A protein has these predicted regions:
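Mono-ADP-ribosyltransferase
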Residues: 2-246
């Protein structure tokens, strides 16, 4: 595991309130695109056919990638344990490697916020490593205290929306990605995006955007939960930071 590096003249602590407040937090898909697209194009143009095929397949359906990485055998809920399921269990072993290699090349020289939505309590509880009861019955204060104790490692790829309100709903995770975070903007080539999909040349722009508006954080990323909030409608929002990656 390698610790994230940081440089430049700003506050040397990437997790300072100053850096987090100044980070890019796109309010629209267009704003996110203006920040993320150029680097994505550079990486895409240099990618191999196998790498492009792999990440495009992921955007079409991520289950065959993420289930074995999380230790589920062929369907969600059939949990065997992380590392106990062959990564080629659903025929995606080579694609997982190609996608990992591709995302390794995609980093930004800016601090960026992303938003992830998990629609079910089961999914959110699994992501956080807590019982469902904790989400449904604990106070935000108690839940925050528990989650702050231990950083959480997501062994699978983490799909996020690239701007506020983008991506899926349900339990909302605001994810702070300090400069150097390995992640790839996928909207230009995503199967469900409004870009040019797999045929994208790494240069053509777009003016409309899909609701997923996806950016994918590298698999094996460790997150630190820093805040839990509940609004008047009972919706839980979690703030977290990328602290370590493979």
């Amino acid at each position: 595991m390698s610790k994230l590096k940081n440089g430049g003249k700003e506050n040397p602590n990437p997790y300072s309130e100053e850096r987090k407040a100044a980070a890019v937090w796109a309010q629209t898909a267009e704003e996110a695109d203006s920040v993320l697209r150029e680097r994505c194009g550079e990486v895409w143009r240099k990618a191999t056919k196998a790498q492009k095929d792999a990440i495009y397949s992921y955007t079409r359906g991520s289950g065959g990638f993420n289930r074995p990485l999380r230790g589920h055998d062929r369907f969600w809920g059939n949990f065997k344990g992380v590392g106990k399921v062959d990564l080629n269990n659903e025929g995606r072993g080579a694609a997982i490697k190609h996608m990992t290699d591709l995302i390794d090349k995609s980093t930004y020289d800016r601090d960026i916020w992303l938003q992830r939505g998990i629609e079910t309590a089961e999914g959110a509880a699994s992501f956080l490593g807590v019982p469902i009861e904790a989400l449904e019955k604990w106070s935000p204060k108690k839940l925050e205290a528990e989650l702050k104790k231990t950083p959480k490692t997501e062994h699978a790829f983490t799909s996020c929306g690239s701007a506020k309100g983008q991506g899926f709903g349900g339990y909302i995770f605001r994810i702070y990605c300090p400069k150097g975070t390995k992640m790839m903007y996928a909207e230009p080539f995503s199967h469900y995006g409004y870009g040019h999909k797999r045929k994208w040349d790494g240069k053509k722009p777009q003016t409309d955007f899909g609701y997923e508006d996806e950016t994918i954080i590298q698999r094996g990323t460790t997150f630190r939960i820093t805040k839990v909030e509940k609004d008047i409608h009972g919706q839980l929002t979690f703030e977290m930071e990328v602290v370590e990656q493979i």
